[in-house]
Amino acid sequence: MIAPSVYNPTEERLLNRAKKYQADENINIYGFKHSGEYKGIVVFKTENKTAEILDIAVNPEYQGKGIGSRLIDYIFSQFAVNKITSETDDDAFGFYKKYGFTVIDTKLNRDIKRYVCECIKKVNNT
């Protein structure tokens, strides 16, 4: 499920990433399951009231149906964080922008433009 969010997702790279995630107690993995199938997944690390999205992926058949947004909503609602950060490329930038993330930096990685984004938790004052 996570392969679409990984650059050059070889079996070895995916296995190494899974081992890295299992070894870090600050990393959380949550999936969105519907009708017995996982439709989306988010991997994130929490530290000092901030969550960093390491991977987020939604089954292509279910993209555009709000699953990615619900995964981010879950992080804000279930963890004591007031900010979420993520690094992404052109493929997912529109998703983050639509959710409300803003670009705080850009960089090149393997000649691919990367966007460092953040989203501050919205406070309801009504």
Q: Which sequence ranges carry the predicted segments?
A:
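Conserved acetyl-CoA-binding loop-helix of GNAT-fold acetyltransferases
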Residues: 58, 64-77
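Conserved active-site alpha-helix within GNAT-family acetyltransferase domains
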Residues: 90-113
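Conserved beta-strand in the GNAT
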Residues: 31, 37-45, 50-57
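Hydrophobic, well-ordered beta-alpha structural blocks that scaffold small-molecule cofactor pockets
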Residues: 41-43, 70-74, 98
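Short loop/turn motifs at secondary-structure junctions and domain boundaries
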Residues: 20-26
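Short amphipathic alpha-helix that is part of the acyltransferase structural core
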Residues: 1-16, 33
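Conserved GNAT acetyl-CoA-binding A-motif
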Residues: 77-91
